[in-house]
């Protein structure tokens, strides 16, 4: 595609493109909020649109302005080219990252048309779509599984395991909750319930305010309490 021509005066917006692969489906909205609060966004997020009967890889793409302090990294001559002062970022889950590579090689980037490639084996094409549907279900189910697990630990007063499964933050295996906090939660489950009801995105937002945080059970409780 030719940019900066009379027929297409648009500028290239993704000279720099970043792909971020996430563990969990609900991380998509968290990362979206982080980007919107950190950089100036152009237009809106481009996201997967599928009907109730369709299955497509879940991803979101956004275009943002370069902070002005980064302009000096590039030669001035470069900005005379049809290149916009923007970058593009894409978020997708780890399940769909693997799928994306297979799908592009075997479908979208193939020189053969999709109909020609699958001719005589339409049932296999449907099975491939079923695999995609299972990936979408896996993304959703994984989050729901840990939500239920955290609730079970809450009901059984397993406070450390409740925090680990609720917030899904990587921590040192030797991390332990302060005995005074354990005693407080054991004595008053309503207090423990307030921490159980906290949102994961709020914790991540607070962690991002720290320089090189080392997550632990005690730090989680402190940040959520503050």
List each language-model region with its residue ranges.
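An acidic, glycine-/histidine-flanked metal-binding catalytic module
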Residues: 83-225
């Amino acid at each position: 595609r030719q940019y900066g021509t009379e027929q297409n005066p648009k500028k290239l917006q993704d000279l720099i493109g970043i792909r971020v692969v996430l563990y969990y489906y609900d991380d998509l909205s968290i990362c979206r909020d982080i980007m919107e609060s950190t950089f100036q966004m152009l237009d809106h997020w481009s996201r997967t649109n599928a009907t109730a009967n369709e299955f497509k890889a879940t991803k979101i793409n956004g275009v943002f302005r370069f902070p002005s302090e980064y302009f000096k990294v590039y030669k001035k001559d470069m900005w005379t080219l049809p290149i916009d002062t923007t970058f593009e970022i894409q978020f997708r889950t780890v399940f769909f990252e693997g799928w994306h590579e297979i799908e592009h090689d075997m479908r979208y980037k193939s020189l053969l048309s999709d109909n020609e490639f699958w001719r005589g084996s339409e049932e296999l094409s449907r099975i491939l779509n079923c695999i995609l549907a299972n990936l979408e279900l896996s993304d959703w189910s994984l989050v729901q599984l840990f939500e239920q697990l955290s609730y079970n630990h809450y009901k059984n007063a397993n406070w450390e395991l409740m925090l680990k499964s609720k917030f899904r933050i990587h921590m040192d295996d030797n991390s332990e909750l302060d005995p005074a906090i354990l005693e407080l939660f054991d004595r008053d489950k309503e207090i423990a319930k307030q921490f159980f009801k906290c949102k994961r995105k709020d914790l991540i937002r607070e962690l991002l305010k720290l320089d090189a945080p080392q997550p632990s059970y005690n730090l989680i409780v402190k940040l959520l309490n503050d």
